[in-house]
């Protein structure tokens, strides 16, 4: 405890500022910066100080508020009945104290309905005459966000009830462990930041402005509260059973328990079972079962007096660091990973944990041979929390961060005050390998059959040095690969050829430009329509696009200023790779050739017949070999013969090769 009022005042001020910052990151940005147990410890300390020094209590203290402020672009919703937070405890002794307070207020022992504490986002569902009218988040408890359009894509939320009742239910929106792993894998492959845990993935997915994003994210719900339930429903346990009959997804693990001893057994049971559940839980919730007694006990300004959450302590194990590996990513970032003695943690065997960057490595002061404490962030991602200094070997020496790239041996650098360590050699084998693999990935150019192992062989046999080289591969080249027979060769060549027709946003994303993820590439392509305009766009023009910030804009402009990038784009275009935006549904954006039947004739000076055909097809044209009344346009080069004469006779519009190229580059909307 602080020794004086002045010391307490200073500590309270610091705690409130820190907790406000952490709460903003957690509730409003869906991006936690500390583990839950760290936040809980600081919060408990603030409560302790405010209790010891009542004069320091303040209405604007985080201990007197619910959740976070509502500052998103989603419509705002005022809750008719406030969505309160929940008090929490961290030991069975504190749970016993809660039980004693309840018994003292009621005058006798009570039964509890005990439920699993799902790690998700609070959700309200309002129904009118049995139809879903509105769905909203908790927000600050008084005002939340309208997420009705998004909730319609959550499969287990009934859009219509079997009874035409007007009511409100509340529960938790969450993401299963399987859906979370799949989402993070897709985001990682797409070059986007991964979510720290399923709770934040669920929150970020539910609070999307675009419901189509929510639809892809596989969210689920557990409903556990009925606001003003119908007459005849007298208990929490009964309310859950009746909500299940109406079609709501309720958790089957809830139980009505008569005494605290049974509650302790329940805690012990699910402490052991939590890792095997398909969703993340971070504790159990104890609720007075009798609804009338709940009403008698009432609420504080922030939490109900009739319920409490018991939070599981963070599960930690000790293990020994044997090695620190450094891997090079496609953008040149070099990442350290601790290789440890395998240890069983939270339901799986863990032997590796990312150390993210040299700054974190230095902050933790991890050394070879160190015993470290390991936990899983959000019960999913292994992390080292601290070094057990009492077990550090006597001959231990500080770990020296490498100065040379582990792949190419070039110097490693820090760019513009980044914490990341980078290799800036564009010919670095690891970067080339990662870059080509990314370009061929399902989220980018989707070249089936071109995985990491094949890419590694292509590089090892000196067949490719960059992504453009893929489009110049021949059957003879591919025959040099191990276990690659005629069928595999043909399939890969077909897949590479098909990728030429992709829309330009896939090419842009496939280039692996730092900070440019799949969504950003799509927004940029939609705005500028073709690669030429994208490459010449200024930072100001790029940041004028909604959600495109300075980081992305500066990365993009810096990339296109490089001579190597200009050469690469030229070779891709020469290979017939489409450089135009084909629209939302893969259809060509409006242009002169869209929807027209075109015939090519004569000797073409700028492109081969095949290359010109691919360009026209990418713009939505149909290219045929003969002139007829159905032909809409003839493009001719030197020494054009009978096809030009026939087109003139049928009065079919005719363009020289130069005129056609001009039309392609203009992308005008002339019909």
UniProtKB/Swiss-Prot annotation:
Species: Lactobacillus delbrueckii subsp. bulgaricus (strain ATCC 11842 / DSM 20081 / BCRC 10696 / JCM 1002 / NBRC 13953 / NCIMB 11778 / NCTC 12712 / WDCM 00102 / Lb 14)
GO CC annotation: cytosol
GO MF term list: DNA binding; DNA ligase (NAD+) activity; metal ion binding
Known cofactor(s): Mg(2+); Mn(2+)
Active site, UniProt feature: 117
EC numbers on record: 6.5.1.2
Family of the protein in this entry: Belongs to the NAD-dependent DNA ligase family. LigA subfamily.
NCBIfam families listed in its UniProt record: dnlj, PRK07956.1
Metal-binding among keywords: yes
Alphabetized HAMAP family for the sequence: DNA_ligase_A
Enzyme class: ligase
Keywords tagged on the record: DNA damage, DNA repair, DNA replication, Ligase, Magnesium, Manganese, Metal-binding, NAD, Zinc
Key word tRNA-binding present: no
Primary gene name: ligA
Coiled coil: none
Record domain BRCT: where: 588-671
Job description of the protein: DNA ligase that catalyzes the formation of phosphodiester linkages between 5'-phosphoryl and 3'-hydroxyl groups in double-stranded DNA using NAD as a coenzyme and as the energy source for the reaction. It is essential for DNA replication and repair of damaged DNA.
Reactions accelerated catalytically: NAD(+) + (deoxyribonucleotide)n-3'-hydroxyl + 5'-phospho-(deoxyribonucleotide)m = (deoxyribonucleotide)n+m + AMP + beta-nicotinamide D-nucleotide
Full protein name: DNA ligase
One biological process term in Gene Ontology: DNA repair
Residues that, per the record, bind Zn(2+): 405, 408, 423, 428
Record-listed NAD(+) binding positions: 36-40, 85-86, 115, 138, 172, 287, 311
């Amino acid at each position: 405890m602080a020794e004086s009022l002045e010391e307490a005042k200073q500590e309270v001020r610091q705690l409130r500022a820190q907790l406000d910052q952490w709460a903003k990151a957690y509730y409003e940005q869906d991006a936690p910066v500390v583990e839950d147990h760290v936040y809980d410890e600081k919060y408990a300390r603030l409560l302790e100080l405010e209790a010891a020094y009542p004069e320091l209590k303040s209405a604007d203290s985080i201990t007197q508020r619910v959740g976070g402020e509502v500052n998103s672009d989603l419509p705002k919703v005022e809750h008719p009945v406030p969505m309160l937070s929940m008090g929490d405890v961290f030991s069975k002794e504190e749970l016993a104290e809660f039980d004693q307070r309840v018994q003292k207020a009621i005058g006798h022992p009570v039964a509890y309905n005990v439920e699993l504490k799902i790690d998700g986002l609070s959700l309200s569902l309002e129904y009118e005459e049995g139809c879903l009218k509105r769905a909203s988040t908790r927000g600050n408890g008084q005002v939340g966000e309208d997420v009705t359009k998004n909730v319609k894509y959550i499969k287990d939320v009934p859009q219509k009830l079997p009874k035409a009742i007007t009511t409100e239910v509340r529960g938790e929106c969450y993401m299963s462990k399987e859906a979370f792993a799949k989402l993070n894998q897709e985001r990682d492959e797409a070059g986007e930041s991964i979510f720290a845990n399923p709770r934040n993935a669920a929150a970020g997915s539910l609070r999307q402005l675009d419901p189509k994003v929510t639809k892809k994210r596989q969210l689920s719900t557990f409903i556990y509260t009925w606001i003003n339930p119908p007459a005849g429903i007298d208990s929490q346990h009964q309310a859950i059973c009746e909500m299940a009959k109406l079609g709501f997804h309720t958790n089957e693990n809830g139980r009505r328990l008569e005494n605290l001893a049974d509650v302790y057994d329940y805690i012990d049971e699910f402490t052991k079972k939590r890792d095997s559940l398909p969703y993340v839980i971070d504790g159990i919730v104890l609720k007075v079962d009798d609804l009338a007694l709940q009403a008698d006990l009432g609420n504080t300004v922030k939490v109900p007096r009739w319920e409490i959450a018991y939070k599981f302590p963070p599960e930690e194990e000790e293990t020994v660091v044997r090695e620190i590996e450094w891997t090079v990513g496609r953008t040149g970032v070099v990442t350290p990973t601790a290789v440890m003695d395998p240890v069983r943690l939270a339901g799986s065997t863990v032997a590796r944990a990312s150390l993210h960057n040299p700054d974190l490595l230095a902050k933790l002061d991890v050394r070879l041979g160190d015993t470290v404490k390991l936990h899983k962030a959000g019960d999913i991602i292994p992390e080292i929390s601290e070094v057990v200094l009492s077990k550090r070997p006597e001959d231990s020496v500080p770990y020296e961060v490498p100065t040379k790239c582990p792949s190419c041996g070039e110097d490693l650098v820090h760019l513009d005050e980044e914490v990341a360590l980078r290799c800036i050699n564009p010919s670095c084998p690891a970067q080339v390998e990662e870059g080509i693999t990314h370009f061929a990935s399902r989220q980018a150019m989707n070249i089936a059959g071109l995985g990491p192992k094949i890419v590694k062989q292509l590089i090892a046999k000196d067949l490719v040095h960059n992504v453009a080289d893929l489009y110049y591969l021949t059957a003879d080249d591919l025959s040099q690969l191990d276990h690659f027979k005629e069928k595999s060769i043909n399939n890969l060549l077909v897949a590479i050829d098909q990728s030429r027709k992709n829309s330009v946003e896939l090419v842009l994303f496939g280039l692996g430009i730092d900070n440019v993820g799949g969504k950003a590439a799509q927004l940029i392509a939609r705005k500028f329509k073709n690669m030429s305009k994208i490459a010449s766009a200024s930072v100001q023009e790029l940041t004028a696009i909604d959600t495109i910030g300075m980081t992305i804009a500066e990365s993009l402009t810096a990339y296109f200023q490089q001579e190597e990038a200009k050469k690469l784009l030229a070779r891709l275009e020469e290979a017939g790779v489409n450089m135009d935006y084909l629209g939302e549904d893969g259809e060509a954006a409006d242009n002169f050739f869209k929807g027209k039947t075109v015939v090519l004739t004569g000797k073409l000076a700028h492109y081969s017949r095949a290359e010109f055909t691919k360009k026209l097809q990418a713009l939505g044209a149909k290219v045929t070999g003969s002139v007829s009344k159905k032909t809409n346009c003839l493009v001719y080069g030197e020494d054009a013969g009978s096809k030009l004469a026939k087109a003139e006779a049928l009065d079919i519009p005719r363009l020289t090769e130069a005129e056609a190229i001009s039309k392609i580059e203009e992308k005008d909307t002339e019909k």
